[in-house]
Amino acid sequence: MTITTRHDWTTEEIQTLLELPLMDLLWQAQTVHRDANPGYRVQLASLLSVKTGGCEEDCSYCSQSIHNSSDVSGFEAQMRVEPVLERARAAKEAGADRFCMGWAWREIRDGAQFEAMLEMVRGVRGMGMEACVTAGMLTDDQAGRLAEAGLTAYNHNLDTSPEHYEKIISTRTYEDRLETLQRVRKAGVTLCSGGIIGMGETLRDRASMLQVLASMNPHPESVPVNGLVAVEGTPLEEQQPFEPLELVRMVATARILMPHARVRLSAGREQLSREAQILCLQAGADSIFYGDLLLTTGNPDVEADRRLLADAGVQANWQENASSLAIKAPAST
């Protein structure tokens, strides 16, 4: 099969995909995924909150906003360089080949903290790992300096559709987000950008968000697909949980639209059964966050993920064959 990469998908076409009978949608996604990702390799990415809480933004889903009253909304000091690099080393030893670092900032500001960020990026790259940063908006000069430090990717999620956006965030515009992504790309750093389902959006909103991502040329290097984790103390704390198959549909549709992007199964994975997670891998997810914490919310532990991947018959990027993932079953009696 020859994969045709398109950048002209319409919202209507994407909504039609999302509405397909599940087996038909999975078949289409599988056809693309098997061609684009022979061997079913899955990237293991580890995520660390370097600067937690005290964020000036009012994102309705976020526990780190000063506008919300969660346990982590208050300010915490930025971690120092060496402890961050120690965590990166531990992540690599556990099997991760990408280390993502998060700062709860509205925007990057020049000064000692930015210099420390650059040192962290250089340190992670020096270990032979990919380095990703998420830290809000940035300038052209800052994007250029991050590129010089060796940054692999910059994460800046769209979160939701342009139409639903103002119901979720008021302190930063959708255009601000798109301009940030343009600056990153101009500097030669790849994009990591996706969104969240389960925030009261419609199916049309989900299609619209995917349309924005799929219209980018080239497509983002990584597309995180998140399910809302309703955190106490945030405006969305009483939001009804998303249906697991809705996340499967988002993964499958993202795979069809962006054949060569890494579709990363991200926040909300703890709310999925093992079977639903394996279905997401079948639908086209080829990256997961690895480790028991994602910034401030929970994630399956390392051993559970190793067993999950082994049972699914997929392999991590750094492994030569799927059998090396196997975990011995208890001896029968």
Swiss-Prot record:
GO terms under biological process: biotin biosynthetic process
Catalytic activity from the UniProt record: (4R,5S)-dethiobiotin + (sulfur carrier)-SH + 2 reduced [2Fe-2S]-[ferredoxin] + 2 S-adenosyl-L-methionine = (sulfur carrier)-H + biotin + 2 5'-deoxyadenosine + 2 L-methionine + 2 oxidized [2Fe-2S]-[ferredoxin]
Cofactor: [4Fe-4S] cluster; [2Fe-2S] cluster
Pathway membership: Cofactor biosynthesis; biotin biosynthesis; biotin from 7,8-diaminononanoate: step 2/2
Residues annotated as signal peptide: none
Family membership: Belongs to the radical SAM superfamily. Biotin synthase family.
HAMAP family for the chain: BioB
PANTHER family cross-referenced by the UniProt entry: BIOTIN SYNTHASE, BIOTIN SYNTHASE, MITOCHONDRIAL
UniProt name for this protein: Biotin synthase
Originating gene: bioB
